[in-house]
Amino acid sequence: MGYALPGDLKNIENEAAWGDRDNPKTLYGMLSRTVQNFPNHDAVSYQIFSGPKDKAETLSWKDLFDKTTQAANMFRGLGVEETDVVAYVLPNSNETLLSLLGGAIAGIVAPINPLLDVDQIAAILRETNAKVVVTLKAFPKTDVCQKTAEALALAPNVHTVLEVDLLRYLTPPKSWIVPLIRPKYKVQH
């Protein structure tokens, strides 16, 4: 049955109780089922610039599932267990979604708004007891890397920092220029 009108909601709810439905119990299970049903359908798309002809990266459900599984396995390889926290301080990108999904499958995920100030980011890292942080590599016209580095100095619980480079989303000549003007800031922890 499809959902077309608000009254259809009751009909769908009356078909079976939520617990009696054959729904996946985990995020990984939900992604597995979706990729079985729609492997080649578009799942997510990202472009760094919003022009109609600007380069975009689109992932199918199969691609998203494979990359999410790879991210979850990477986090597990870094020692993340079910009760450990993976935090990310990232702008919107495909890597942000992969950090969210992979982190949630491997352990607990803590998204942190990159617009917060250093003290707020540090407080979230401490309060969540984040073990791993995924953040942006130094990039022109953004201070995410710098703020995260300063916050890490106030969050001794973090063991691993991973950096995402948005350079791959750029095309020439911007992709040639960014390495020359990239801020010289390295996250160390």
Describe the predicted segments one by one.
Residues 4-9, 30-60:
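AMP-dependent adenylate-forming
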Residues 17-18, 50, 138-141:
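Short histidine/acidic/glycine/proline-rich micro-motifs that form metal-
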Residues 108-189:
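Structural core segment of the AMP-binding/adenylate-forming
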Residues 43-93, 97-100, 117-122, 177:
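Conserved AMP-binding/adenylate-forming core of the ANL superfamily
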Residues 34-35, 102-103, 125, 152:
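A generic structural signal for well-ordered alpha-helical segments
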Residues 76, 100-107, 126-127:
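Short hydrophobic alpha-helices that are characteristic scaffold elements of the AMP-binding
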Residues 86, 103, 133:
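Conserved S/T- and glycine-rich ATP-binding loop of Class I adenylate-forming
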Residues 1-28, 47, 165:
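Flexible, non-catalytic linker and terminal segments flanking ANL/adenylate-forming cores
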